[in-house]
């Protein structure tokens, strides 16, 4: 769902044409899971907005045990009780967005006083036995990312991802654009981060295709070279069941509805096929930054 208890400066969903649709109920989401299983889709990520705002989250995770399951969250509602329930429902991993080890910086970027709750949520998830990672969208305000990694390690986190700012939603507004790192600045941040992560025994991945050349990322020692997976390795379902190319691609391209259209029709949709063909080139680009987005939306 896209309801949220934060107002992040770089939110990919905020202000999007499909950002205010009506949510499916519990029974409908369970039907979605059945259809995804029938299509042999191996992994489901519960994301948002903020998925922990749904009272049926544990029930849905429990219904999704056939899949590899992941939860993307800001962590603020990960109480000891909810963390334990998610663990018992066989949630495979949880990714918490942590912008900074500094409360003032984190709070400025999420638009609310949420740092304490997020840190508590990370601690609770770790204590419950969940596999926990942090994700950090990088910008000029939190470029001291190495400190955030040190802090996360002190909380018991051993996995981290970071990204550039996806040009979608609020991240296209003047306030967000003003904080974007240049390629050289991003390279400097990643160089320090890779070194610190290695010293802490953490696994670190950079997940944004197209921000830096492949040779630069390999030279930094990053093991994952990101490439666009839209309509190829991942797709997304909006709160009303509409299928879109990826969770950030909410500007008007719709590929069908998972509850009313057969999966084969969605998968073979001409728009889906065109986007997938671009993804399959493995050119390490983000299609939200290329002309293919405009062509698909035309």
Regions found by a protein language model. Name each.
Residues 2-5, 222, 280:
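Processing junctions and N-termini across compartments
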Residues 3, 7, 227, 285:
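The −1 position to Zn-ligating cysteines in a subset of zinc-ribbon hairpins
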Residues 218, 225, 242-298:
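Flexible mid-to-C-terminal extensions adjoining Fe-S/redox cofactors in radical SAM and related proteins
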Residues 1-93:
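Conserved alpha-helical substructure of the radical SAM core
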Residues 4, 46, 96, 241, ...:
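Conserved, mostly hydrophobic/aromatic
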Residues 6, 13, 233, 248, ...:
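Short Cys/His-rich local motifs and their 1-3 flanking residues in nucleic-acid-associated proteins
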Residues 19, 88, 99, 104-227, ...:
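Radical SAM enzyme [4Fe-4S]-AdoMet core and its adjacent flexible, acidic
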